[in-house]
Amino acid sequence: MSILKMMLIYFAIFWVVNAAQLLDIDSQGVIPGAYIVVMKDRVSSLEFSSHVRWLKRTHRRNLAKRATPFTEGLGATWDIAGWQAYSGSFDEDTVQEILNHENVEFVEPNKEMQVASTIKQGNVTWGLSRISHKENSSHDYVSTYGEGENITFYGIDSGIDINQADFTGRARWGINLADHVDTDCNGHGTHTAGTVAGQKFGILKKASIVSIKILDCYGYGDITRYINGLNWAINDAKERGLLGKSVMNISLKTRRSRAVNEATVRAQEAGIFIAVAAGNQATSAEFYSPGSAPEVCTVGASTRNDTKAIFSNYGELGMSWSCILFYTTGTNVNHTVDLFAPGEYIRSTLPHNLTGLMSGTSMATPHVCGVGGLIMATEGLAPEKVCDRLKELANPTIQNPGFNTTNKLLYNGSGA
């Protein structure tokens, strides 16, 4: 074999090995033809801008070659604490060229996102009293960490009814990335916000509230809207001097997504404490995002009797088979539930000054978000340190938490 031929084979192998991966770990909820492209960490801002210009030229060239009416191309671009990525809709030829680009780490399909809760009925409200007492025997709420003064809460959800009386004029509309209805026409976002920051139903009773709408009236959105929401929140907090003094509740889910997990972690690194729902499929949270994201605080739902709610996802405390199988993709799936919080029959705010009961890890997560805000403000902790502190304070009282899963229940450290 000639030296030239050997060199050609070598470079062909090198090119294949170093090409970016197209991650299609799970096809459920995939939006056809829509993608998220994530750059390598070493890529500079100038290189990213150059890549975007290259992408636009490549997309136009391939459209002309195929004589196709398909024209969407580049969507949003993001830089979240150095995590650079973009969304868009591209033909197969363009996707292949993106995968072969030296600065691209991976590409994955855009997927649907939706609320992570189920609605139930009843006539009970008990969550606040439970998280403020070590023993499950009291019906009052006690807090020695204040009421969230100087904390800002960002709710990424179906929007928030900023005129809800329980928010006492502290809420403002941030951005609508879902539709043309600048209010919460689903109710999920207002309910979770009430548990975080309502005057009667919430923990951060004096915090500022910001609505980021990424889900429509039916509770559906997608990954692109989600990352747009994260990016907007980081920029807003930065402009207003709120980094290190903000919290975010994410009671949403999609099938496992490396892009969602990475963007969520980087958003917390930028300066916002983040609590995420484990999900309501009664299975391992490792199969869903952002519940499988490392470093952020993943929350399971507990009942009034301190058991794992029947619907709540759980999480293994070590390397799972899925983590081994998908290790080469770089997907972080060995991080799941950090602690539990009340998530069954939780009463909170709804649009139009109504209240209602909901159940789900969506309802548990706002409790952690709220207590996290109190701890961060009072103890001066960095956002990425808050979850560890919450786990230190938590009580090991959850019965039957799930296979190899923590038994820790959220506690606000009141001393009661």
Curated annotation (Swiss-Prot):
EC number annotated for this UniProt entry: 3.4.21.-
Transcription regulation is among the record's keywords: no
InterPro entries: PCSK9_ProteinaseK-like, Peptidase_S8/S53_dom, Peptidase_S8/S53_dom_sf, Peptidase_S8_Ser-AS, Peptidase_S8_subtilisin-like, Peptidase_S8_subtilisin-rel, S8pro/Inhibitor_I9, S8pro/Inhibitor_I9_sf
Gene Ontology annotations for the cellular component aspect, listed alphabetically: extracellular region
Compartment(s) where it occurs, according to its Swiss-Prot or TrEMBL record: Secreted
Record's keyword annotation contains Protease: yes
Active-site positions on this chain: 157 (charge relay system), 188 (charge relay system), 362 (charge relay system)
Residue ranges of the propeptide: 20-116
GO molecular function terms attached to this record: serine-type endopeptidase activity
Signal peptide limits: 1-19
A Pfam family matched in the record: Inhibitor_I9
Functional description taken from the UniProt entry: Secreted subtilisin-like serine protease with keratinolytic activity that contributes to pathogenicity.
PANTHER family hit by this protein: CEREVISIN-RELATED, PEPTIDASE S8
Name of this chain's protein: Subtilisin-like protease 12
Organism: Arthroderma benhamiae (strain ATCC MYA-4681 / CBS 112371)
